[in-house]
A protein has these predicted regions:
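Active-site hotspot residues in diverse enzymes, especially metal/ion-binding acidic/histidine motifs
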Residues: 1-289
Length: 289
């Protein structure tokens, strides 16, 4: 089950529920999943779990010591396990970490994000402007989610070329791309190191919690990309978990003109090298603000 399948399942589930007040009250989701929720003090790093009784009723337990936004996410994550009928595979990996996490857990995170930030509500409320620290914080507060969750949602549903990248211990773990970037085959390699020269690399090097925004070359982030183009990078580092996130974006007219195949991979020009003429070509276009 890939991301698209999970999102389709989540939206089908949402369509059967009254979500008019879902940003304040998750009980319609809980009822639709034939579940109840209880709070309990759990161990550090344990966000929650679900027990199913013989009568088919599900009991979702969440860690009362965690923040309200984290508890909301856990409820939706556990509902995902119920609706998708996926076994839990938490093992010893922290719930916030992508490293070595089972695909079931990542799928349930995707489902939970759909429930917390229903795409129709999101699109009707998100300002039609470029991302900023203030905008993402505003959306996170509006939907009762974390800053990284809101940043990822912004990138994946944006009309502009936009991406969201999660990095742990100096390596890329996950990247979400807007439709505009997927259509041109933009790719950020998982498990690659944080690129030197990026905002993410700069702020992680400080060793402190930090947020910053700056322009960087597009080809720092995207594989096999045209040089001479720039993008904006908004990055935040969480020192305690050594986690870094970045939102990358630029104007549509700064997209390179490329062809992609039916798998979304870029088609490289295979016509060979141009004949040498003895004349130097003009430099490629470079757009900076």
């Amino acid at each position: 089950m890939d991301d698209a399948d999970v999102r389709q399942e989540a939206r089908g589930f949402i369509a059967k529920v009254d979500i008019s007040n879902i940003r304040e009250d998750l009980s319609p989701y809980v009822a639709a999943a034939n579940a109840t929720v209880k709070q309990e003090e759990l161990g550090e790093g344990e966000s929650g779990y679900t027990i199913t009784r013989p009568n088919g009723k599900h009991i979702i337990t969440v860690n009362s010591l965690e923040t309200e936004e984290r508890q909301r996410f856990t409820i939706c994550h556990e509902i995902a396990h119920i609706v998708l009928d996926l076994e839990s595979s938490h093992e010893e990996v922290p719930s916030w970490s992508y490293a070595k996490r089972h695909q079931n857990e990542i799928a349930c995170d995707t489902f939970a994000a759909e429930l917390l930030m229903p795409y129709k509500q999101w699109l009707s409320r998100v300002p039609k402007e470029e991302p900023s620290l203030e905008l993402i914080q505003e959306m996170a507060q509006l939907f009762g989610t974390s800053f990284p969750a809101a940043a990822s949602r912004f990138a994946s549903l944006s009309d502009m070329p936009c991406a969201f990248v999660t990095m742990e211990r100096g390596a890329v773990r996950y990247a979400a791309r807007s439709t505009a970037l997927r259509n041109v085959g933009a790719w950020i390699s998982p498990r690659s190191t944080i690129p030197v020269g990026s905002v993410a690399h700069l702020i992680r090097s400080s060793g402190n919690n930090r947020t910053d925004t700056a322009e960087v070359p597009q080809d720092l982030w995207f594989d096999n990309w045209d040089r001479g183009l720039v993008l904006w990078e908004l990055s935040r580092h969480y020192a305690r978990t050594d986690t870094t996130i970045s939102v990358l974006w630029f104007d549509s007219d700064e997209l390179p003109e490329v062809e992609v195949n039916r798998f979304g991979k870029r088609i490289e020009d295979d016509c060979g090298l141009a004949e040498l003429t003895g004349e130097l070509p003009w430099p490629g276009r470079s757009k900076r603000r």
